[in-house]
């Protein structure tokens, strides 16, 4: 979807009625599709607030004459954007670090910053690639809380790719399970948990409630 890999010959990728197969990232973002990668890609030497503001660039509506004669209009718009981005940083718990460089954040904080930048694009669909990878149990719980609030606060549809079962089971309404690239189950978390194909592929056996609780723990 992001253009890193080409689709199979003869196929294409459609989002919200638009063919985005060969579109550049800024056009895909402007259509309302945002994503995070497992490998973090931040501007390490830029401040936290500027990293988040970089995600808003597709929404900025400067015109040529504004830059020439409308400086106050630009300044007012930039202040509005910065205020909105500070509210977003507060939402993910990073407001106190706004003026620090991204390189000064911990690994868990950087993941939250990447998430905030993706939200700043105001997407219709937000795709998260293993958002909990490498996080401590406390940070995983915090991330899950934020994900649950995202759906209500920003009206987002989310697609989450994640290997930590607890995150999947506690945050997703619908779960799709793949085994070696093939879909083997789809349904609610409770339906998928009891699916024989899923049990065989991922758990190896039928589990009682206590064993399942331990398996779902981080």
What is each stretch, according to the model?
Residues 168-170:
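A short, surface-exposed alpha-helical micro-motif characterized by mixed small hydrophobic
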